[in-house]
Amino acid sequence: MASKKEYCSFCNKSSKDVPLMIAGPNGMNICSECVEKAMDLIKQHDKEEVTKEVRSIPKPKEIKKILDEFIIGQDEAKKILSVAVYNHYKRILRKSDTDIEKSNILLIGPTGSGKTLLAKTLAKILNVPFAIADATTLTEAGYVGEDVENVLVRLLQNCDYNIEKAKKGIIYIDEIDKIAKKSGHNPSITRDVSGEGVQQALLKIIEGTIANVPPQGGRKHPHQEFIQLDTTNILFICGGAFVGLEDIIKRRLGKSTVGFETEISKYKEEGNILSQVEPDDLINFGLIPEFVGRLPVISVLNELTEEDLIRILTEPKNAVIKQYKELLRMEGIGLEFTEGALREIAKEAIKRKTGARGLRAIVEKIMTDIMYEAPSLVNVEKIVIDENKKPVYMYKKAG
């Protein structure tokens, strides 16, 4: 306990005039009032720093241009996302008398079409914290699994528990279609009615609430202190394949359209039938109306074609083949994939139904032995991968 003669080294108040005096090294002291002021200054500084970072948000065209560098195809989805993200952060920064709702996003598209990569790249462009959650692991209270608040734990962890930064982060929830409740319209859903409970629990944090977040995760550490996190300005992007949704849309179009088959054929020619999705279709699929209402921006991603996959292998800044070329260049060896090799890799990804996600696994399998041998190779100038996905070694000319 501080003695009566002690004074604060910052404000010079006596220990008699403040609730608490904290003794430091070399006779230095600080009173509890100065500690509170210091904490307020730190919070204000953090707010200003985060606001500065977000204030430099690029315009929609600039966002799409950067997305184009990393993601092949999906032009319409990239436009929709660029506008939604720009409006979301503009809404945070520029206070208005008009109540502008949050532009949470729903991405619908097959496995490997780029949903996760789009969300991750957006967070990178905007320099905001980012977290990914898998909806299939989430359960409502009373069931075995993760609490929905664990989604927020990951976001806090990814920004070193800086609450101000976390408040303006992006959370991507994958496989959101798997928590749809069972319905007669969508018999493919196997999850029981607890899926609706998870939707209700997620609804609160998605629409904006002061959430009590267990910093070490919920159920394994029941006695920890909670962190309060306001989710009002966190952007939520939900994604899923929604297998069976196409049939629901077809049924709706069939009921409302004369010449049903002609109308369906027209949509098939123009593109993805899923692009005709409406909120009622998602409700019939098994999402509750309130949940659908909190995801006002819906974007549909197309299945990637063989040509798209070939471009993904070679064109983006972080293309997997570019990465291997650079690794072999460091060994003084060139690397070339023939057009036939690229096409065979793309065909295999389509056959596996893994889309862009499966390309890396296929290329890594081809390259494993090459990367094992490369550091020991002598006089090899170039390695060419042909349509049989086998390496051909080109040696340096003697002399």
From Swiss-Prot:
UniProt keyword list: ATP-binding, Chaperone, Metal-binding, Nucleotide-binding, Zinc
Sequence ranges assigned to domain ClpX-type ZB in this UniProt record: 1-50
GO molecular function, a single term: ATP-dependent protein folding chaperone
Pfam families for the chain: AAA_2, ClpB_D2-small, zf-C4_ClpX
Binding site for Zn(2+): 8, 11, 31, 34
Metal-binding as UniProt keyword: yes
Signal peptide: none
Positions bound to ATP: 110-117
GO process terms (BP): cell division; proteolysis involved in protein catabolic process
GO cellular component, one term: HslUV protease complex
Record NCBIfam families: clpX (TIGR00382), PRK05342.1 (NF003745)
Function recorded in the entry: ATP-dependent specificity component of the Clp protease. It directs the protease to specific substrates. Can perform chaperone functions in the absence of ClpP.
Oligomeric form and interacting partners: Component of the ClpX-ClpP complex. Forms a hexameric ring that, in the presence of ATP, binds to fourteen ClpP subunits assembled into a disk-like structure with a central cavity, resembling the structure of eukaryotic proteasomes.
Family that this chain belongs to: Belongs to the ClpX chaperone family.
Name of the protein described by the UniProt record: ATP-dependent Clp protease ATP-binding subunit ClpX
